[in-house]
């Protein structure tokens, strides 16, 4: 299992948006695929890109782009990293344990759980009741939205108060104005939002966020070159204003046991466009909309076809594949516009 990690600089800015223009926490797998496809068109001839897509579309799966937290010890130069995955959309609660209002609010804020916590969730699935018999309050909560096991932060000389104060990003609103091309008059005043990376110094540790995604399958040199080019080209919107640069790229290998074992149920780590025969496997899910205009160096910016996808963290009663969908506008013939709705799944429950 190949993992690509990106280390943005302190104060790096990002604009990850949805179809309504609102900020998102992450880049979903379909958006990541589109960004890589656009970078491939910049690097290679469109016919070569079609060839690469045909060769790899059924062999390689991409997860969405997720966050990690890096703890760098400034005294000894050692670093420790924690990787986070989306919280499953199925209920997560301890059996026969009442929850008060304060604890409910704390648990509700958790959006991401660490790899170690996900391993615990895999064994906590209750087949008959269809929920996770697990207490999220047993985990260490970082910055309110992230949760990990005590073992994953063992050895760090930080207390619970320090963990709660961890902040990876801040959202900035910048005033903007639309200037008419005809008479240079200001027409509309608005605010543009963006996320800004924050490095924090706590005790001996420099705490910083990084981003990563997982690839399942064999990558050739062309795809690796495209991914590295995308880090320089940038991801998300407002790149002409300096947004989206991912910084240093690091590749590493992960063992397959967490992802390729058999399970009773599956949780998605990607956005998914299921086939008609796969809809019956839906258990817990949320829908997200994809629309907007195409981004291409060829031709005009036309509105692409609107689709709805299953959100990361959706739970399925069986393994599904998803599909790649052609969303090209009818009037755009320079090259195809694809949406990657392939399913990247992680099993839960014992077989």
Task: Cite the ranges covered by each PLM segment.
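Conserved active-site/ligand-binding neighborhood in enzyme cores
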Residues: 1-351
